[in-house]
Amino acid sequence: MEKVNEERDAVFEDHIGDRRRSVRSLLEEAFADEMEKTSYDVEVADTPQPHIPIRFRHPPIAGPVHDVFGDAIHDIFQKMMKRGQAVDFCHWVSHLIATEIDEKFSEVAFRDVQYNPDIYVTDSTTEAKKLFNDKIWPAIDKILQQNAETCPILSEKWSGIHVSGDQLKGQRHKQEDRFLAYPNGQYMDRGEDPISVLAVFDGHGGHECSQYAAGHLWETWLEVRKSRDPSDSLEDQLRKSLELLDERMTVRSVKECWKGGSTAVCCAIDMDQKLMALAWLGDSPGYVMSNIEFRQLTRGHSPSDEREARRVEEAGGQLFVIGGELRVNGVLNLTRALGDVPGRPMISNEPETCQVPIESSDYLVLLACDGISDVFNERDLYQLVEAFANDYPVEDYAELSRFICTKAIEAGSADNVSVVIGFLRPPQDVWKLMKHESDDEDSDVTDEE
C-alpha cells in the first residue's frame, strides 16, 4: 500500500517551469473543508437541525441538452476560482471534474451531445444541472482516491503559456463579467492543440450572455479548429468561433427570453508561428505590452465613433444623449455585442478582428473590461505591472490580474472589473525588465530574443 501511495503521489507531481505545486496539493487545499468533514464528521441520529430561513426563487428555465456540459464546466470553474486557485488550474480541473461526473454519475453522456440548431431538447436538463453541482466533491474524492494505475497523469497538463486572470464585483450589486484564460488546447479536451485562448466578456442587462460566452467559447473554438481549412488564418478561425458562439447564444436567448448581451474581447496566441489574433465586439479593450509601453490593439465599438454611429443610423437606429453620453435608441452605449437580440440590427453581432506578429520586444497581452480602461490608460497599466514586479516575487505572477483589478477599484472604478493576461515571454523576463536596476542591465533584457 505504501508503494502504491508513493506511485500515486509521483503521478500528481509537477516539475514544469515555476509551477512547482503538485495538482494533488492544490486539490487538497481547495477542498480542505470537505476532506476534514469526510475524515471525522459523523451524523448523529435524531440530532435537531438548526433553523435555516428558506428564500423563494423562481425555478430556472431548463436549458438545452447540448449546453449542459459547457454550462457545468463554467459553473465548476467559477466555484474553483472562489476557492482562491490559479486560473489555469481552475480551467484544467473544471474540465476534469465535469468529465468525471459525466462518466461516473450521469446516465446521459452530456459531453457527447453536439449542437444542432434545429433541435432544442430540454428533457432532464434541470436535474442534470443539479447533478453536476451536487457531485463536485464526490468527483474530486474519486479522483484523489484512484489508484496509481488509473489516475490521470496531471503533470501533462502543465504546459502552454503562463496566464493570469481575475475579477472583482466592485461597487456593482451583481457580477456580470466573465472571463477565460486557456494556456493551450490541452486544458480543453486533452488534445495537442498548442493555441492559447484568452477572453473577457462584460455583460449588461444580466449575466446570462457573458456566462454563456465564457462557458461555450472553448466548444466553438475546438469545432472551428477541427474543421478548419488550411487557408484559414488564426484571425479567420477566431472570428468564425465567435460567430458560431453568437449563433448558439441567439437560439438560447430567444428560447429563454434573455434581454441583455455582452461585450467580448478574445485573443488566440500561436507561439510556434509567433502570431496572435484578436476579435472583439463592444468597448472591452485588448493591449500588448512591449519593453517600453502598452499599446491598444482594439477599437471601441461605441456611438461616439463616427463609423459606428453612421452604421447604426443606416440600420435604422437613432442616437440620443442620455446622462451625458450617446446611446443607441437611448438605451445602450455600445454599437456591437454578443446577444442583445432585440436590439439588432442596430446593435451588430459582427466581430472586428486583427492579426499581428508577436515581436521579440512583446512581453504580454492584457484583456480587460471598460471598468479597467475607464480609470487606467496605457501608461498607467505599464506602471502597475512595474509596481507589481518590484513589490512581489515572480512566483506570484498569477496574482498580477488581481492586483490591477484591486487598484482599479481603489482608483474609483464603479463597474465590475476583470483582467486576463497572457505572458508572451516567461514571467521571469517581465520581472527582469521591470526591476529597478541599472540602465545597462535593463537594456540587456530588452535586447534578448
From Swiss-Prot:
Gene3D superfamilies hit by this protein: 1.10.1740.220, PPM-type phosphatase domain (3.60.40.10)
Any single GO CC term annotated in Swiss-Prot or TrEMBL for this entry: Cul2-RING ubiquitin ligase complex
Result when mutating D370A: Loss of catalytic activity
Positions of Mg(2+) 2 binding: D202, D370, D415
UniProt: Mg(2+) 1 binding residues: D202, G203
Alphabetical keyword list: Apoptosis, Developmental protein, Differentiation, Hydrolase, Magnesium, Manganese, Metal-binding, Protein phosphatase, Sexual differentiation, Ubl conjugation pathway
Effect seen on changing D415A: Severe loss of catalytic activity
Region (Interaction with fem-1 and fem-3): 28-34
One of the record's GO molecular function terms: phosphoprotein phosphatase activity
Region (Interaction with fem-3): 54-56
Domain of life: Eukaryota
EC number: 3.1.3.16
Catalytic EC class: hydrolase
Consequence the record notes for mutating R336 to K/A: Loss of catalytic activity. Prevents male development. No effect on the interaction with fem-3
Cofactor note: Binds 2 magnesium or manganese ions per subunit.
Cofactor(s) the protein needs: Mg(2+); Mn(2+)
Catalytic activity: O-phospho-L-seryl-[protein] + H2O = L-seryl-[protein] + phosphate; O-phospho-L-threonyl-[protein] + H2O = L-threonyl-[protein] + phosphate
CDD domains: PP2Cc (cd00143)
One BP annotation, GO: masculinization of hermaphroditic germ-line
Function field: Dephosphorylates auto-phosphorylated Ca(2+)/calmodulin-dependent protein kinase unc-43/CAMKII in vitro. Involved in the regulation of sex determination. Together with fem-3, required for male sexual development by promoting the proteasomal-mediated degradation of tra-1, a transcription repressor of male-specific genes. Promotes apoptosis.
Subunit structure: Component of a complex containing fem-1, fem-2 and fem-3. Interacts (via N-terminus) with fem-1 and fem-3. Component of the CBC(fem-1) E3 ubiquitin-protein ligase complex, at least composed of cul-2, elc-1, tra-1, fem-1, fem-2 and fem-3; mediates the ubiquitination and subsequent proteasomal degradation of tra-1. Interacts with tra-1. Interacts with sel-10.
Official protein name in the record: Protein phosphatase fem-2
